[in-house]
């Protein structure tokens, strides 16, 4: 029996931001036979337009339960996405940029883990990537492996031997690979959102790290970019 057959109908939680990476991660989970629930975090981010994109993507993926959880990380600040700090637009630079949100993926994965255990799901998918990315420390394979260990230690299901699997299927893909994977899965990349600093009329700015990586990914993949840039 194939792995997909074994997974048929088994529930997975998809951390869904509304971005291209999380959409493709969810598409891979669906292709593998999982029944999908999605968790989107409304953390009072600058680019709140991604929350509407998450709704569109969830519907396209056939998610049967989509929870949008409010969590005001602007109360902490410390990031261009949650504070009055300009979003860098000088290209992808070495080091960790100001768009890094302190401990964001640790927080989000912890919430997804709680959602998973509460609903009996044992699989969590997220779209982190450690190749074409902005250098965030919580996107690295070492972080995912460490959180996997934490999940098994810190939960009732984990200590009872049922365990969880943290899936990061895009971990070692380039942005071009991800764009091609979206096309292969039949996903409409145009419904996703990547920009950190949207224009007042609802366009991608075209200059932030996330826009640059997205645009380059489609170009390198030889695919038409459906994104509307300013």
Swiss-Prot record:
Q: Which residues bind ATP?
A: 16-26
The Enzyme Commission number assigned here is 6.3.4.20
Give the signal sequence positions.
none
Q: Which cofactor does it need?
A: Zn(2+)
Q: According to the record, how does the cofactor bind?
A: Binds 1 zinc ion per subunit.
So what does this thing catalyse?
7-carboxy-7-deazaguanine + NH4(+) + ATP = 7-cyano-7-deazaguanine + ADP + phosphate + H2O + H(+)
Assigned keywords, A-Z: ATP-binding, Ligase, Metal-binding, Nucleotide-binding, Queuosine biosynthesis, Zinc
Question: One Pfam family from the UniProt entry?
Answer: QueC
The set of disulfide-linked cysteines is: none
Give the domain of life. Answer: Bacteria
- CDD domains, A to Z: QueC-like
Q: Where does Zn(2+) bind?
A: 195, 205, 208, 211
What InterPro entries does UniProt report for this protein, alphabetically? QueC (IPR018317), Rossmann-like_a/b/a_fold (IPR014729)
Q: Which pathway does the protein contribute to?
A: Purine metabolism; 7-cyano-7-deazaguanine biosynthesis
**Does the UniProt entry include the keyword Translocase?**
no
Q: What class of enzyme is it?
A: ligase
Q: Which family does it belong to?
A: Belongs to the QueC family.
What name is this protein filed under? 7-cyano-7-deazaguanine synthase
Organism in which the protein naturally occurs: Rhizorhabdus wittichii (strain DSM 6014 / CCUG 31198 / JCM 15750 / NBRC 105917 / EY 4224 / RW1)
Taxonomy, top ranks, is: Bacteria, Pseudomonadati, Pseudomonadota, Alphaproteobacteria, Sphingomonadales
